[in-house]
Amino acid sequence: MIRYLLSKLLLIEAVLLLVPVSVAIYYQESSQVFIALFSTIGILVLLGGLGVLRKPKNQRIYAKEGVLIVALCWILWSFFGGLPFVFSGQIPSVIDAFFEISSGFTTTGATILTDVSVLTRSLLFWRSFTHLIGGMGVLVFALAIMDNAKNSHLEVMKAEVPGPVFGKVVSKLKNTAQILYLLYLALFSLFVVIYYLAGMPLYDSFVIAMGTAGTGGFTVYNDGIAHYGSSLITYLVSIGVLVFGVNFNLYYYLMLRRVKAFLGDEELRAYIIIVLVSTGLITLNTLHLYQGVS
């Protein structure tokens, strides 16, 4: 079952790589970029296709298997997700490319790049797209679109979702994943529009919104959000990161008008308190730097 599920996940990543392909087509990028992307897609389709030829009889997944599947998925997706950078020569080192994309999928936001302008628009988009996919969890995304996601896959989702407790918001696991991801994508789309209306170019709006959704912070320029010279954009991005930092189960409660369940959540209260206290302390610590600045 581990082999079968991981193979399906490789096929899903192959489909996801069609997104940067479409960006490369739009911006009429070099043939080297297309070769890099399609070579990676070909490898993923070959390996994934071979792995799903034989469907396992026992499709039960236990806790230990769930943890193993999650760990292997992160490693495999990061390795193959980094290959377009290696094949195109934009990040020649396999290790550096692996680090860059694992930072994206895990929404860490760390980077080996000192100059992001070396990346073409398609691969810069893919780099931030990994934030969007990883923000809710790679396996949550996969379970949301798999046609046969079952409640037996709950152990995978438990191992994937951060936090002390994972609870299904509806009876079926697939429906839970779909609801959470629809909420996630709806908020992402909202912030794309907000950033665009605030003055960002459309491409930048997508890239920054993906970095916001994953709370990892990948951007388009070396100087990040400061590049736009807009306090409004800075505030909007800060608000966006705070919004996406909330447990998405709670947003589902809001949809159901269960306001008490939302406001009474201990995790949410702790989150707000930590943000307010840390913001206050940092403000006090840096206040002297801005004295006399008009």
Language-model segments: residues:
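Membrane-proximal intracellular helices of multi-pass ion channels
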Residues: 1-294
